[in-house]
Amino acid sequence: METKSRLLKRNPEPVRTLSRPQVTVTQPKEEPAKPQPTPDAGVGGSSLDTMVAACAVELMNARNSFHRLHLKITGPGSYAAHVAIGDFYDGLPGHADTLVEGYQGVAEKILTLKDVAPRTLDDLSDGVAYLREMYAMINKLQGMLPYSEIVNNLDLVKDAINSAKYKLLFLK
């Protein structure tokens, strides 16, 4: 009795050599240069610098304008408006500081903050209109900013504006 081998038979064709994939080593990409704002002659900085400074000044002035409005609200729904405006203006100095400090850090320059008189708000409709104007100003600035962290901080200001507007329009 003959024993059959259970071994596999070798293929008679020649063995093919496998080619290894070519590996290419690349140098790490250089970090892109920091975007440079457009020059603005006569201001001592760029137009972006000027707009960020103007936004910060507007936030600081809005604090005073809304504080005064907060103190003169009377009539039906005045308590809800009083509280809503109080919550809003309390946060504005922090938002202004965050904007200026963050921008000065990323741009590595000190902004010039000009003195501008605060706006006078006579009633709630003036306050709501001012909130809408501030929102539009911030939206425009965000569209010009190359720094995502500053854009995100400005989103928080817009969130505070939206919350105040909601409370003033719908909570009585």
Annotate each language-model stretch with its function:
Residues V52, A56, R63-H70, A96, ...:
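A structural signal for well-ordered alpha-helices, especially hydrophobic packing surfaces
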Residues T50, D90-G91, P118:
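A structural boundary/capping signal
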Residues A62-D87, Q142-Y147:
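Helix-loop segments that flank and shape redox-cofactor active sites
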Residues M1-S47, A54:
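Intrinsically disordered, compositionally biased, charge-dense segments
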